[in-house]
């Protein structure tokens, strides 16, 4: 209940009104004036409207130009650059400032003697140095690049901040020149893209020394054994390796492979399984296509046997008709090996590294199987689909013969890799086989 507080105004009970020019005096009985205290008003269930975010005007980032150079006019900036007044990272931002004023690299070179290549190196090097400062790197590390550090920092420009700090420390500790810094940066940047390469798992990606060691280790495998170049690269890889695992991998390569490993390498050279990468839009642009039923490797033999054996296209529209219903199909271009298969089926695997001995990318693949060719031949150049624990797997003909296996689920005809934007390679090379 609300309590009301009445207050009577103490004005006169008479008031005057003017009617047709005459004053009329009549008593007026005023109603009490009521005030309601705010404490007695019940709170509303409605929430107050959210506060709107106030408009924040654009504030440009702080100028990279040191305070002592900010008041300079154009002539003053040119004078500082021409005379190299100050440290390189202090006057480097002046070059960008002149660009915004309409100067070009050739005109700046003519006025200051700084070539276009050096201008770019100074600008980028200063930006890399700023990222090291903002990352909280040790002051002594930053100071190591105060003199002639632009070229070194320019080389690590493509690395992220964490990698830049690690690379900068490695460069300082080992006294690298520009070429050494560039090799180190490329080794760190390239390491993740070498997924599946031989020996990659023996090197630590988080250590610049191991990244550089792996690059040298990988290059050594491009040369025949024995050779002076190969030995030199492996010795350098051993010197730069940090972890014990990486050192052992390099030592194994340096001291030579065992006879068993050599035999295995020779066997790999005769593999005849074609491997292709499907390109975006290739199916749509193909003059002919092949439709195949699809099974997952983990579904096992039972699912494979259920897949339709007979299917063909006909009629004016090329409608595909199968002997039984099936839920999963794949459309492939009319490649000759696939067209030649009469009773084919496609088996999907989730990780290519666990299927065939190649330098896989950890991606899904589709394996085309010829179900008419089930007899196993003692040849390492052929692969066959066989039953395995938890599904199906691929194995060499010679290995199966040694195990006493004479019949398989079918022979491998083709391995198809999925389309990728960053991979222009359409067929796997012989040297990519592990």
From Swiss-Prot:
Subcellular location: Plastid, Chloroplast
Highest taxon in the source lineage: Eukaryota
Transit peptide: 1-51
Region N-terminal alpha-helix: start-end pairs: 65-254
Main location: plastid
Keywords: Chaperone, Chloroplast, Plastid, Transit peptide
InterPro entries: RAF1 (IPR037494), Raf1_C (IPR040858), Raf1_HTH (IPR040781), Raf1_N (IPR041358)
Keyword field contains Aminoacyl-tRNA synthetase: no
Region named C-terminal beta sheet: 273-419
Pfam families the UniProt entry points to: Raf1_HTH (PF18579), Raf1_N (PF18578), RuBisCo_chap_C (PF18087)
GO biological process: ribulose bisphosphate carboxylase complex assembly
Gene Ontology cellular-component annotations: chloroplast; chloroplast stroma; plastid
Subunit structure: Homodimer.
Annotated family: Belongs to the RAF family.
Domain commentary: Has 3 domains, the N-terminal alpha-helical domain, an extended flexible linker and the C-terminal beta-sheet domain. The N-terminal alpha-helical domain stabilizes RbcL dimers and RbcL dimer-dimer interactions, facilitating RbcL(8) formation. The C-terminal beta-sheet domain probably dimerizes Raf1. The 2 C-terminal beta-sheet domains are swapped and pack against each other to form the dimer interface.
Physiological role: Required for assembly or stability of RuBisCO. Acts at a postchaperonin step to fold and/or assemble the large subunit (rbcL) into RuBisCO. RAF1 binds first to a rbcL dimer (rbcL(2)), leading to a rbcL(8)-RAF1(4) complex formation. In the next step, RBCS displaces RAF1, thus resulting in holoenzyme formation.
Protein name in the entry: Rubisco accumulation factor 1.1, chloroplastic
